[in-house]
Amino acid sequence: MSHTPKSAGSSHAPANSQTALVIGAIGVVFGDIGTSPLYTLKEAFSPHYGLTPDHDTVLGILSLVFWALMLVVTLKYVTVIMRADNDGEGGIMALTALAQRTLPGGSRSMYVVGILGIFGASLFFGDGVITPAISVLSAVEGLEVAAPRLEPFVVPITLVVLGMLFLAQRFGTERVGKAFGPITLLWFFALGAIGVYNMARAPEVLHALNPWWGVRFFAQHNWHAVFVLGAVVLAVTGGEALYADMGHFGAKAIRRSWQFVVLPMLTLTYLGQGALMLRNPAAVSNPFYEAVPEWALYPMIVLATAATVIASQALITGAYSVASQAMQLGYIPRMHIRHTSHSTIGQIYVPAVNWCLLALVAVAVIGFGDSASLATAYGVSVTGTMLITTVLMIIYARANPRVPAPLLWLFALVFLAVDCAFFYANIIKFLDGAWFPLLLGLILFTLMRTWRRGRKLLHDEIRKDGIKLDTFLPGLMLAPPVRVPGTAVFLTADPMVVPHALMHNLKHNKVLHERNVFLTVETLQVPYAAAGKRLKIDAIGDEFYRVHVRFGFMETPDVPLALMRSCDQGGIYFDPMDTTYFASRETIVASANRGMPIWRDKLFALMHRNAAPATGFFRIPGNRLVELGAQVEI
């Protein structure tokens, strides 16, 4: 997951490189949607929906599944949404940044778009809990078909598989990741082969490709058909990954993978399961494994487990990536990030995210107990994210003069209707399990909003009580303190105000360094900062400098490296072994009389206290950093 957008997406890449990207995309991007056949039709015919697997109902459900894949994935994501790239990057955070750029800065509408983006990212993490749980559990449930006596061991085996997966994250996926594409490719061909095997025995199932059967299903079942969409949407879960991983593999490779491999194989496997149910209605108990020939059952269970582990791995890696972006954009506190590859910057491991996901996934597996129960909880976070993506796309496209207004309104009407129908079909299952991912999303949304608001209040308080740098320095130099050799770098969020760390240094040590740099780090709403805009240096006299460093939200801030570059661009003498970094470490004091409600003030104080220090986040050597404390009331 490390290709830069330009290399990944280049249309002039060599054929062997494009083939590698296609296979890589199949392994990472399509793992989630590729494991949906394990449980989609099983859920559609579960007692929860009260459907009987007669001829018309089977064809109706199959038609809805096929056209959901065509409308939501092929038309919406592959054809339209993937055109909205933020310098090659996709995903809901990137689309939020694009939509905000079309709105007046500081406006109410820009604020609302930011809220939508945060909530969409929060729902993504809810999806990140359900996907590994339901995928691996569905695969292991094949043991119930092969040997019913093993049913009591399904949950323990699932927990062991998931535990090993999360424990292995710290070692990175660089080596095993190379096998993801071929294994998932084998999985898709196995899906297609099983589909053809069963379709040959009931070729009339091909009639389901006619949308008339889907329309007929709605005509026969009225509002109950909308309710059934809660199961149909399981077929398109993972569609968001096509857009989210666009920066890693490029739009071209993802489109080719979908058109020539994934869509045909998914269509064949769903039709194959439908053909089986037409011949044997009792197969609805687990149509995926019932469709597998008896001799291939155990190998298929192993392959399915491998495919679901790969799907889970892709989502876990995506969670790390989104968390890293959210940190860079200031939505969540800094956390320790480990780079698991010497050659690939994008391969990271975030321990806090990993252990939180493991705990929540284990709770989901134990609490729900089987894939049928988890399926009722699954769709709401996915459909919520899809709906928010559509709204953000409409806002972004509105400002694009190349998009004709009639085409935009057609897109809005069709996909708002589709997404709202899917979301409604899942939200009405609130008491049956949909509350779980919504609760997770709401908790994360509250944390992100509290952190964002708390940081602004903290910045405002520091600025209010601060002294203007331009008036402080001339007064200081009237009676200059003793200057000692070396360079002092003061990290500051506001380059116009005297940093607390400088004031403390003067108060307690009564010295100034030979050179003093006021360094501000800014994260842009683009994935990668352009070379010409990365660094800005202002010399303000007497060996004082303002240095403004910009990073994209996909980059890892490296302050020492930025200062090395400042030697060439701004003439600042910089010796890493002769430089001391100073940072303020504020202690938050919650107050009931200002800012946020007292409970949010206390929550922010707790988050701030547990945030990772700047040392690791900005790649500052620990033996070169001095942190000075300050109390701030918010």
Swiss-Prot record:
<dbReference type="Pfam" id="PF22776">
    <property type="entry name" value="K_trans_C"/>
</dbReference>
<feature type="transmembrane region" description="Helical">
    <location>
        <begin position="223"/>
        <end position="243"/>
    </location>
</feature>
<feature type="transmembrane region" description="Helical">
    <location>
        <begin position="258"/>
        <end position="278"/>
    </location>
</feature>
<dbReference type="InterPro" id="IPR053952">
    <property type="entry name" value="K_trans_C"/>
</dbReference>
<dbReference type="GO" id="GO:0005886">
    <property type="term" value="C:plasma membrane"/>
</dbReference>
<dbReference type="InterPro" id="IPR053951">
    <property type="entry name" value="K_trans_N"/>
</dbReference>
<feature type="transmembrane region" description="Helical">
    <location>
        <begin position="110"/>
        <end position="130"/>
    </location>
</feature>
<comment type="similarity">
    <text>Belongs to the HAK/KUP transporter (TC 2.A.72) family.</text>
</comment>
<keyword id="KW-1003">Cell membrane</keyword>
<feature type="transmembrane region" description="Helical">
    <location>
        <begin position="403"/>
        <end position="423"/>
    </location>
</feature>
<keyword id="KW-0630">Potassium</keyword>
<keyword id="KW-0633">Potassium transport</keyword>
<feature type="transmembrane region" description="Helical">
    <location>
        <begin position="179"/>
        <end position="199"/>
    </location>
</feature>
<feature type="transmembrane region" description="Helical">
    <location>
        <begin position="58"/>
        <end position="78"/>
    </location>
</feature>
<keyword id="KW-1133">Transmembrane helix</keyword>
<keyword id="KW-0406">Ion transport</keyword>
<feature type="transmembrane region" description="Helical">
    <location>
        <begin position="377"/>
        <end position="397"/>
    </location>
</feature>
<protein>
    <recommendedName>
        <fullName>Probable potassium transport system protein Kup</fullName>
    </recommendedName>
</protein>
<feature type="transmembrane region" description="Helical">
    <location>
        <begin position="348"/>
        <end position="368"/>
    </location>
</feature>
<keyword id="KW-0472">Membrane</keyword>
<keyword id="KW-0997">Cell inner membrane</keyword>
<keyword id="KW-0769">Symport</keyword>
<dbReference type="InterPro" id="IPR003855">
    <property type="entry name" value="K+_transporter"/>
</dbReference>
<keyword id="KW-0813">Transport</keyword>
<dbReference type="GO" id="GO:0015079">
    <property type="term" value="F:potassium ion transmembrane transporter activity"/>
</dbReference>
<comment type="function">
    <text>Transport of potassium into the cell. Likely operates as a K(+):H(+) symporter.</text>
</comment>
<feature type="transmembrane region" description="Helical">
    <location>
        <begin position="427"/>
        <end position="447"/>
    </location>
</feature>
<feature type="transmembrane region" description="Helical">
    <location>
        <begin position="21"/>
        <end position="41"/>
    </location>
</feature>
<feature type="transmembrane region" description="Helical">
    <location>
        <begin position="152"/>
        <end position="172"/>
    </location>
</feature>
<feature type="transmembrane region" description="Helical">
    <location>
        <begin position="296"/>
        <end position="316"/>
    </location>
</feature>
<dbReference type="GO" id="GO:0015293">
    <property type="term" value="F:symporter activity"/>
</dbReference>
<dbReference type="Pfam" id="PF02705">
    <property type="entry name" value="K_trans"/>
</dbReference>
<keyword id="KW-0812">Transmembrane</keyword>
<dbReference type="InterPro" id="IPR023051">
    <property type="entry name" value="Kup"/>
</dbReference>
